[in-house]
Regions:
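A penicillin-recognizing enzyme superfamily signal
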Residues: 78, 290, 294-297, 301-303, ...
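Active-site SXXK
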Residues: 82-83, 229, 300, 373, ...
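Short, well-structured active-site flanking segments
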Residues: 91-101, 174-177, 236-241, 490-510, ...
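Mid-domain, small-residue-enriched loop/turn segments at the edges of structured enzyme/sensor domains
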Residues: 514-519, 551-589
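Conserved catalytic neighborhood of penicillin-recognizing serine enzymes
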Residues: 110-135, 189, 256-260, 449, ...
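Short active-site loop at a secondary-structure junction
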Residues: 67-72, 403-413, 436-441, 464-484, ...
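Non-catalytic, structured segments within soluble enzyme domains
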Residues: 22, 113-379, 546, 560-561, ...
């Protein structure tokens, strides 16, 4: 009895000592323990997502991949799998598992091994939020105290939800939602039992056990998890047998991008990082909605790439990427055996080689395995065997120079050989020999009413070059400058009916010691010509004469109204021919002024920003070209209503925290801000109408006086509300096409990144038929096709707009030869628009011509000729 009494006393003393020890340890560590109340308002590090205006995902930015989910959004089987392997008694214990702790203590006492785990899910949550993963006794004790605090603060479901969203699961994925996407490209509800088991097994060692890093390790750990799931009756034996027999197949998956706009994504990323800093931009879960329309964006990319492929094919085939083995063409009667092959690779070796090749856009690496008279066989990555028919090969004459190509091939033997690594792409469901285009291009479309960017593609491939040619490439614009020159002329006394002299200019430049002879392209001169017709036909010498008549200072002042920087505008007569260097975005913004009635809008791409919870943090309020609307003029905006996107965003981020949503009253109080009117509505209408003549031409074909404008191919769109202009620079180094309707302004540029390289000339190709495009590259031949392809998809959503003549313009019938009034109503006359007071006062007679000549006398010199645009 006495020993029982002693044992009870000893036990009581040990309990008291234990309580005192625990209390002492707690008070000793208390000051070092984090404040767990922060878990009540925890903000998970979630990547920034960028969307199109219609909600398609463009990109995701962030160090940590996370897809936060509510507990009720997770499949029960996934939750039960984690509980089975990590914490079976989770809903029963107070945050610590006493049985597990005793087991760990026993192992430590007997072997000194600290690797034995006893952490509950609550303890793991405490460690993930507040502590390191080091296996030290002090850290473990802190973990226990924190777990108890957390259990008092949060419900079990709240703890489990935080854990399943916070836990590190390898490959920079955090939480089950991200792991399902990263490893399997699925949502959590699409996971199979074996995939659930793989994910549930990752917390133990996410780096070593993830299926991308080691399929064998992942399989072994998966089987352990499946065993626990069977043991705890989460799954039955049939499900267990099926899951344990499944192979481990996994690869890295990115975010489910549904809209391709990498140049836009990068613009947004840079903007957000500049304003928020990297940590907030990449981890606050911001949802950025852009102005991009996904369907238009997809067509813009297709139009740009297809146009570059077409240009590339016109100029010839540069040969294979590589030759894996030598094949020598020999003469033989059997066309199947015309190559003698030296040490060809086996099928396995070919596939191993192809697996190492990276894809470029829609180009697929392939190895030629056999060549026939007018076809070739190839194998592409993945082992698919394909046949290249003659239609996909016949274009491939050899490249000689940018100006010359080889003869048209007659057989496939002249094009490819077995063992060659080539690039293929699919076009019209047929495989086609291809190559990475060397030329570059850019396309941008904006809403002229407010500057919203609807489509933007800054180059052939963002993965190849992150240089955004829409916003960064300043290139000479050629004849795309002429509408702005003509606009200045209309401000200084000229009309669309003014007669100009379309005749060669020969002027001696005493400073340069050479003669300046600007030429038309083509070198056709019509003599007396109306301003409307000269613009539509893109007459170079008329543009020079208009600049002389208006004056270079007046021209530059006028061009600055369109947002062009003075330093980009040469202060000499070459300005009239397009020596100014502008980006495509600057140029299309200028054209938007003609489309919207004379207002200068500011291009923007960020429409709104939502918090991770979907609350509106920012709504862009653009300046708008709005005639007759209840608006606030830009120059009268207060500090609370900044006049541009930059100021608006700066103000937002200075006054709002990420937790402060805008309310509906905030949005309602954002009145429409009117853009600055930089030219009159009458001026913009006259230029836009004259540019319609560039599309539809004029005169009477029936009477032999008909003529085409340089943009006549746009007629295929069958719309009368399109205004358009071509542009080509010296030696075809830059080609442009810009056009607009009242609802959409679009500019396309094509050229080489090397500004000194010409786009050259494509010779006639005997294999390609009558529909081919041969000749010197130009705006109409090289840039217009991409513009047309894009517009065929984009325009149908914008109804055709009737021409609304501005107040103040009059329409009178003029004689087409002299620009004077006429009483005739036949093919020799037409109605023309005039600003008040500029209408002709005389009637045309046989002997009257209203011709405006430049004052400088042509000096007939034989000095060196300078070819201009």
């Amino acid at each position: 009895v006495s020993w029982v009494k002693k044992l009870l006393i000893l036990s009581l003393l040990m309990i008291v000592f234990g309580i005192i020890s625990i209390a002492g340890i707690y008070f000793y560590l208390k000051d070092d323990l984090p404040d767990v109340t922060t878990l009540q308002d925890v903000r998970l590090q979630t990547p920034m997502q960028v969307f199109t205006a219609d909600g398609e995902l463009i990109s995701q930015f962030g160090e940590k991949r996370r897809i936060p989910l509510k507990l009720e959004e997770m499949p029960p089987l996934l939750i039960e799998a984690f509980l089975a392997v990590e914490d079976t008694r989770f809903y029963e214990h107070p945050g610590i598992d006493i049985i597990g702790i005793f087991r760990a203590v026993t192992v430590v006492a007997s072997s000194g091994d600290f690797s034995q785990g006893a952490s509950t899910i609550t303890q793991q949550l405490a460690r993930n939020f507040f502590l390191s993963r080091e296996k030290k006794i002090v850290r473990k004790i802190k973990e226990i105290f924190l777990a108890i605090h957390i259990e008092q603060l949060l419900t079990k479901d709240q703890i489990l939800e935080l854990y399943l969203n916070k836990i590190e699961l390898g490959q920079r994925s955090f939480g089950v939602g991200a792991a399902a996407q990263v490893y399997f490209g699925k949502t959590v509800h699409e996971l199979t039992v074996d995939e659930i088991a793989i994910i549930a097994g990752l917390p133990k060692a996410p780096s070593a056990l993830n299926p991308v890093r080691s399929a064998s390790n992942a399989r072994a750990r998966r089987n352990v998890v499946l065993g626990r799931m069977l043991e705890t009756r989460v799954i039955d034996k049939a499900a267990y047998d099926l899951a344990i027999a499944a192979p481990v197949t996994s690869r890295l998956h990115g975010a489910q991008i549904t809209a391709s706009a990498p140049y836009i994504a990068e613009m947004v990323r840079q903007d957000m990082v500049n304003r928020f800093g990297e940590e907030t931009a990449y981890s606050a879960g911001l949802q950025v909605f852009t102005t991009i329309q996904s369907k238009q964006q997809a067509e813009a990319k297709h139009a740009l790439q297809q146009n570059l492929y077409d240009y590339d094919e016109r100029h010839g085939y540069r040969g294979p990427v590589a030759e894996l083995w030598q094949s020598t063409l020999i003469e033989a009667e059997n066309a199947e055996h015309k190559f003698e092959q030296e040490d060809p690779l086996s099928a396995e070796e070919i596939l191993a080689y192809l697996d190492k090749q990276s894809s470029i856009e829609d180009l697929r690496s392939a190895i030629i395995t056999a060549v026939h008279e007018q076809s070739a066989d190839a194998i592409i990555a993945g082992g698919q065997e394909v046949t290249l028919q003659w239609d996909g090969l016949k274009w491939a004459r050899t490249v000689q120079t940018d100006e010359r190509q080889g003869v048209a091939p007659k057989t496939a033997f002249a094009i490819v050989k077995p063992g060659q690594h080539v690039l293929l792409r699919q076009q019209n469901d047929q495989w086609r020999l291809s190559q990475v285009p060397q030329a570059s291009s850019a396309i941008v479309a904006i809403d002229p009413h407010n500057g919203a960017i609807r489509s933007l593609v800054g180059g052939y491939s963002f993965s190849q070059s992150q240089f955004n040619r829409v916003t960064q490439a300043k290139r000479q614009v050629g004849s795309n400058i002429k509408p702005f020159i003509y606009s200045a002329a209309l401000e200084h006394g000229h009309t669309l009916a003014t007669i100009m002299n379309d005749a060669p200019i020969h002027q001696w430049d005493s400073n340069a010691g050479i003669a300046w002879r600007p030429k038309n392209s083509p070198a056709v001169y019509d003599g007396p010509i109306r301003v409307r017709e000269a613009l539509a036909k893109s007459k170079n010498v008329v543009s020079v004469r208009l600049l002389r008549a208006v004056g270079i200072d007046n021209i530059i002042t006028h061009l600055q109204r369109f947002g062009f920087t003075p330093s980009d505008l040469p202060r000499n007569e070459t300005l009239s021919l397009g020596s100014a260097s502008l980006t495509p975005l600057e140029l299309v913004t200028g054209y938007a002024v003609f489309a919207n009635g004379g207002y200068l809008v500011t291009p923007y791409v960020i429409e709104k920003i939502l918090s991770e919870e979907g609350e509106l943090l920012y709504q862009h309020n653009p300046v708008a070209a709005c005639q007759g609307c209840d608006t606030t003029p830009a120059e009268q905006q207060t500090a609370e209503q900044p006049g541009d996107a930059e100021a608006q965003l700066d103000q937002l981020f200075n006054t709002l925290s990420l937790d402060t949503p805008l309310n509906q009253q905030d949005i309602a109080e954002q009145s429409v801000k009117q853009a600055e009117q930089v030219i009159s509505e009458q001026n913009s209408f006259l230029i836009a109408d004259a540019l319609k003549s560039s599309v539809w031409g004029g005169g009477s074909w029936q009477h032999g006086t008909g003529w085409n404008g340089t943009a006549w191919r746009v007629q295929r769109l069958k719309r009368r509300d399109i205004s358009a202009k071509t542009g080509t620079t010296n030696d075809s180094k830059d080609t442009w096409f810009s056009g607009f309707t009242p609802d959409l302004a679009v500019t396309v540029w094509v050229g080489f990144d090397d500004a000194n390289r010409s786009l050259g000339r494509a010779l006639w190709h005997a294999n390609m038929g009558q529909q081919q495009s041969a000749g010197t590259e130009s705006g109409a031949r090289t840039a217009l096709p991409a513009w047309l392809t894009y517009m065929e998809t984009a325009l149908p959503q914008y109804p055709e707009q009737p021409a609304n003549t501005p107040v103040g313009l009059s329409s009178v019938r003029i004689d087409l030869q002299t620009g004077l009034l006429t009483n005739r109503t036949d093919h020799t006359s037409a109605f023309e628009y005039f600003k008040p007071g500029t209408e002709p006062k005389q009637y045309a007679t046989a002997n009257i011509q209203q011709i405006s000549f430049d004052k400088a006398q042509d000096k007939k010199q034989d000095e060196e000729e300078v070819e201009l645009f």
